[in-house]
Amino acid sequence: AFVQEPLPY
């Protein structure tokens, strides 16, 4: 499983 880091909006 891959960890998705929060992307800056």
From Swiss-Prot:
It catalyses: 2 superoxide + 2 H(+) = H2O2 + O2. One of its GO terms (molecular function) is metal ion binding. It comes from the Bacteria. This is Superoxide dismutase [Fe]. It comes from Anabaena sp. (strain L31). Its EC number is 1.15.1.1. Belongs to the iron/manganese superoxide dismutase family. Homodimer. Binds 1 Fe cation per subunit. Keywords: Iron, Metal-binding, Oxidoreductase.
